[in-house]
Design a protein with these regions (language model features):
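Membrane topogenic/interface segments and analogous intrinsically disordered interaction regions
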Residues: 1-292
Length: 292
């Protein structure tokens, strides 16, 4: 793949380095404009963003909190009832609420514009790809966008309530009272959602790392047990101290790892087929030259 050997839009000649920079600049500008557009939309809908999204996971009436508590009642345990008491938040700066509003709008703009950003960079690299590479990469862009949003939703509906409950209820001494700053709360929430969005990109990362030969399905299978241990350690850290919650968080991550192994195996199989076809074509060409 030769990025700087791309053809121009009309395909009549190769683009110069400066022409590549100009094209990349416009892709970046369009990506920034998409972020700004969604940022403005999020800024305008302040009440909906904060009351129904940002502040929702800390409320006892939040979907996940109610569902886990109902499940706990069926199992005759109170361990699953999380965030039963409303969490009070404070603001300690004069301009704190305004800057918080702006920063939340920026994060929302970045999340909502993620597919546009991927598409713009795909359009930049597309001319440098062969037809079969372009086909795979286009599917990867769609899959990456979908996986990112699924990851963000998983972080919001599953990890965020569990983590907020654990962190807000953890105490080193009864004499210490929590007074949680709104920026600390939002920072925790956005970090969780963005982190899980990126973690859910694992199958896409496995796809490209296998394509360039960095990893193999054999390598991933070899270290499967290590991955399982790491996943359960992470789940134990960010969830309440009960096996059910830890398993609930760990299962999707384990599924992602297995899907990544499957994708890596498919890519390796395709690479081997392409190599065999190339060798057969080489042998055929040598035979034809020898007989001519």
């Amino acid at each position: 793949m030769a990025i700087f050997g791309k053809k121009g839009k009309k395909g009549e000649k190769e683009m110069s380095f400066l022409e590549h920079l100009e094209e990349l600049r416009w892709h970046i500008i369009r990506s920034i404009l998409a972020i700004l557009f969604f940022m403005i939309v999020a800024f305008i809908f302040k009440s909906f963003i904060f009351n129904n999204i940002i502040l929702a996971p800390k409320s006892p009436s939040f979907f996940t909190n109610r569902l886990l508590c109902q499940l706990g009642e069926r199992l005759n345990t109170t361990a699953l009832c999380i965030n039963t008491k409303p969490l009070s938040l404070i603001n300690i700066k004069m301009s704190g609420q305004l800057t918080t509003h702006i920063s939340v709008a920026m994060v929302a703009g970045l999340i909502l514009a993620f597919p546009v950003i991927l598409w713009e960079f795909w359009q930049f690299f597309k001319p440098a790809l062969r037809s079969n590479e372009a086909k795979y990469a286009k599917g990867a862009v769609t899959a990456a966008s979908l996986l990112f949003f699924i990851g963000v939703l998983f972080g919001f509906y599953m990890l965020a309530p569990l983590s907020l409950h654990f962190l807000s209820s953890y105490e080193i001494s009864p004499e210490v009272t929590n007074q949680i700053n709104i920026r600390s709360y939002i920072g925790t929430l956005t970090s969780i959602c963005l982190a899980t969005g990126l973690v859910f990109e694992l199958p896409i990362i496995a796809f490209f790392l296998t394509k360039i030969g960095v990893i193999t399905p054999t390598f991933m299978r070899k270290y499967r047990k290590h991955a399982i241990v790491v996943i359960f350690i992470i789940a134990a850290i960010i969830t309440p101290p009960d096996v059910f919650s830890q398993t609930l968080v760990a299962i999707p991550l384990l599924v992602l790892y297995e899907v990544s192994i499957f994708i890596s195996a498919r890519v390796m199989k395709q690479k081997e087929k392409e190599r065999d076809d190339f060798m057969n074509d080489e042998d055929k060409a040598k035979t034809e030259n020898a007989t001519s």
